[in-house]
């Protein structure tokens, strides 16, 4: 989604915003904590979007909601300690479907934790999950087109759902 967000910014503010994808595929919040200094803090960002819920919910990673919250709070605290003016945005994503849901049966609790932390810390939340649920329930074929592997939104889904919602949440 970072590439599609960059394209959306470029379309509105050419050359004024740089989106850096500091994440890595298949990683979860424990990895985020371990790599935060090098991959995020060292870049001195103005804004950081954090979204590890869907991978924290992955059963083989054995990351409880409590540990995921502790990791999330740690990342927030460390980012703000290094740059108090950094805007931190929390984000939920799409529901996993098919085999991916079976591997993440408690995904709702992880997304709710993100909502709770955003509210408690007064952080902006981009809650994509309800939008994705509406798409899934109203037009499964469209959902499948937007999320072709059942877990990762493809470029079209990112361009049509994720990037516009982030821009809207930012008031842009």
Please describe what each predicted stretch is.
Residues 3-18, 31-172:
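Alpha-helical cap/lid subdomain in secreted, periplasmic
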Residues 21-28:
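Short beta->alpha junction loops
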């Amino acid at each position: 989604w970072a590439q599609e967000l960059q394209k959306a910014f470029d379309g509105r503010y050419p050359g004024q915003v740089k989106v850096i994808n500091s994440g890595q595929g298949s990683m979860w919040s424990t990895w985020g904590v371990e790599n935060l200094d090098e991959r995020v803090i060292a870049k001195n960002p103005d804004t950081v979007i954090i979204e590890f819920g869907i991978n924290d919910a992955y059963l083989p990673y054995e990351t409880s909601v409590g540990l995921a919250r502790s990791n999330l709070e740690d990342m927030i605290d460390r980012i703000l300690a290094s740059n108090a003016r950094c805007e931190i945005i929390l984000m939920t994503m799409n529901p996993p479907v098919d085999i991916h849901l079976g591997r993440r049966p408690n995904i709702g609790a992880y997304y709710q934790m993100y909502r709770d932390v955003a509210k408690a810390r007064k952080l902006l939340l981009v809650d994509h999950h309800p939008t994705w649920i509406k798409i899934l329930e109203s037009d499964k074929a469209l959902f499948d087109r937007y999320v072709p592997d059942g877990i990762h939104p493809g470029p079209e889904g990112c361009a049509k759902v994720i990037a516009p919602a982030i821009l809207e949440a930012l008031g842009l």
